């Protein structure tokens, strides 16, 4: 008997199953950090005429403790952002629920060996992890107190493997972010509206320049050499062991010019 009430939904973790509810709700844990963060609706639902909802995604695939290292916490946050973005971008998806809000107790055969599942964007005591800022930053601010600005890196080199910095992202609902080193202005960054997170209301912002014009100001380098050197340093900050062919060519060019 069909009642005049809100649509019903269940939860399932396999494709093309029998639909007994009004909405096909699917636990989509397909994402492994590359490619699309959710499966195509047409490949999952058994009835494309009915509504479709991603009932779970995210945290279960990358358990993250609040005391995990900076890189691990950032990966979790970016995975949540990818899930949110791709569910918004895909036509016909009513919405998505990240699994889950907070870490929780579990039995000894599950979780991380301590009877705790670290799937949440908050810990068990509701203290936010970095990934909580992904959700908080999607609110459009109506007053200064509504501004969210969470930087993924603590900039503590001694806490990073080999003392090598990695990617730095800002989760914010501000229109732009300005970076200073002391009183020296470095650069202003805005969301990439055509990038990986373009479907989000407020995409996270990658900070990819930590040098700006400081080499010209303090080292007396000419603009061309300063620009090339800054590009190399910024790339080394992200991955010092795997420089691109372009950066290697820049290093060679700088060596030749300095030897002249």
Predicted segments with their positions:
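Carbohydrate-binding surfaces of carbohydrate-active enzymes
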Residues: 86-260
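Substrate-binding/catalytic cleft of secreted carbohydrate-active enzymes
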Residues: 1-131, 144-159, 183
